[in-house]
From Swiss-Prot:
GO BP, one annotated term: glycolytic process
Record CDD domains: ASKHA_NBD_GLK (cd24008)
Annotated disulfide bonds: none
EC nos: 2.7.1.2
Organism whose genome encodes this protein: Pseudomonas paraeruginosa (strain DSM 24068 / PA7) (Pseudomonas aeruginosa (strain PA7))
Residues at which ATP binds: G16, D17, I18, G19, G20, T21
Family statement: Belongs to the bacterial glucokinase family.
UniProt keyword Cell division, yes or no: no
GO MF entry, a single one: ATP binding
Record's keyword terms, sorted: ATP-binding, Cytoplasm, Glycolysis, Kinase, Nucleotide-binding, Transferase
Subcellular locations according to the entry: Cytoplasm
Organism superkingdom: Bacteria
Protein name listed in UniProt: Glucokinase
Amino acid sequence: MNNDKNGSSGGLALIGDIGGTNARFALWRGQRLESIAVLACADYPRPELAVRDYLARVGESLANIDSVCLACAGPVGAGDFRFTNNHWSINRAAFREELGLDHLLLVNDFSTMAWAASRLGADELVQVRPGSAQADRARLIIGPGTGLGVGSLLPLGEGRWEVLPCEGGHVDLPVTSARDFAVWESLRERYGHVSAERVLSGNGLLALYEISCALDGIPVRATSAAEVGALALAGDAQADAVLEHFFLWLARVAGNAALTVGALGGVYITGGIVPRFRERFLASGFAGAFASRGKTSGAYLQDVPVWIMTAEHPGLLGAGVALQQALDAESRTGVRATA
């Protein structure tokens, strides 16, 4: 290992956050992001070429970089990775060899949100629900967007963390009212199994709106989640009621997840939906519904704080933190933590 270059000693690394359409890249120096740029995946046959072009654009030499961490949408195992929403794939050995890397780390894209939560400052968070976070307990990260991402962050002491990715978006959707049940029945007719993600996602918000209109005998006026949100913000009563129902369902799912992982360190909300409708979310019944349950479980959650993550590039930040910890672990233990 060349300690003059690797991220564990304040050197230079490359960080990427790769989605279906765009790849965001940054340099990671001294545990900070620099030179952030967004490239279209369709413009490059292979991710290695996108990395080379990014470095050329920011005037940095590949020779100065020996570590790369890429956040990838989908389950990340030990083998090769194929992106589900674009034409790219990564053969770890070939990627390292072509770019001359000592270290390559691939992480799940939602896991980076959990890594980011370990590093965010007060100016990158908006409090939804007051409380007293316990520093030595787990934190929950939940984010409705294209799907419903769920993960947790465990403190290990001495500034070290463990991220536990999961598939919590696929738990059963909780039903607590007659209205919930009516919506759930319609969702079951559409999909069979009704997971939390069937409501708590972009497609889920649209489905909730369509079903609610059908139940109330009101014409459908939106064809996308963005249009539902726009109608709600413009004062449409039906769309606003649907958005409120969405936020209440998020409160129940988040509360259940917090109980499951013991998230007394707090709950962090991310994803593409809640930050977009932040003011409406803050005015919703989320804060009360989060801990509104039986006597014992309600008391357990009563002092758990909830925040919205507002950092501009949490995926890149989280990937940088993940790489930093992996390199530090290698240096400390001598056991390789990267490919």
